[in-house]
């Protein structure tokens, strides 16, 4: 797991590293076409980009694409399907996923039944500090971000911030946010009976019909 939010601890430092070495980041630039040479071993000769100022063509010494499954499928030239490795990419199917965040007024994963006072003491974090897995809920993995990544997710006066990943997400994509939150909250309380009396203070749901996985 990252120490905190991806922008602060992953993409941000990568961007800083590139900028410090003279690189530039161009947002709102979309690859419309990959230009390449013909022959048995074609090479990329340039990229046709759509930009806010109009279409442009760029050439480079090297080309690197970091895409999700739908993105790389759109990017690859159709003619490259004659190569098995590129044709195989079109066989991939992205898995739907729903990510649910639930904030409580105490510490959910404190397991001691006799530790009610400790569970309610939001000034003193307690519980399971790790990425967790369960076979007894519809979320395959979860973590208390307030414990595992307090730099970005701990909030004064609040307790646990559970992030739960619902997979497979197919049944959840058409559901309303309220339904998903209620269902996930109920399963959290079933997994941790000692936390049943905690109050859910905030929630958020992100649904991806085509995830990165």
Give the positions of each predicted feature.
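C-terminal segments that line or cap access tunnels to active or ligand-binding sites in enzymes
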Residues: 48, 53, 60-62, 67-213
């Amino acid at each position: 797991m990252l120490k905190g939010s991806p922008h602060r601890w992953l993409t941000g430092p990568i961007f800083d590293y590139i900028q410090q070495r003279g690189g530039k980041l161009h947002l709102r630039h979309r690859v419309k076409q990959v230009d390449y040479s013909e022959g048995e071993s074609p090479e990329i000769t340039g990229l046709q980009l759509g930009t806010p100022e109009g279409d442009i063509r760029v050439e480079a010494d090297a080309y690197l694409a970091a895409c999700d499954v739908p993105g790389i499928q759109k990017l690859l030239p159709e003619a490259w399907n004659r190569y098995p490795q590129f044709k195989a990419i079109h066989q991939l199917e992205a898995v739907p996923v729903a990510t649910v965040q639930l904030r409580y007024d105490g510490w959910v994963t404190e397991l001691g039944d006799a530790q009610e006072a400790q569970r309610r003491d939001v000034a003193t974090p307690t519980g399971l500090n790790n990425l967790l897995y369960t076979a007894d809920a519809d979320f395959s993995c979860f973590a208390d971000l307030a414990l595992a990544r307090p730099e970005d997710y701990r909030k004064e006066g609040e307790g646990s911030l559970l992030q739960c990943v619902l997979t497979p997400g197919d049944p959840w994509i058409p559901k309303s946010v309220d339904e998903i939150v209620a269902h996930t909250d109920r399963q959290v309380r079933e997994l941790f009976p000692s936390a049943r009396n905690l109050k859910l203070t905030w929630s958020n749901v992100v649904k991806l019909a085509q995830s990165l996985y």
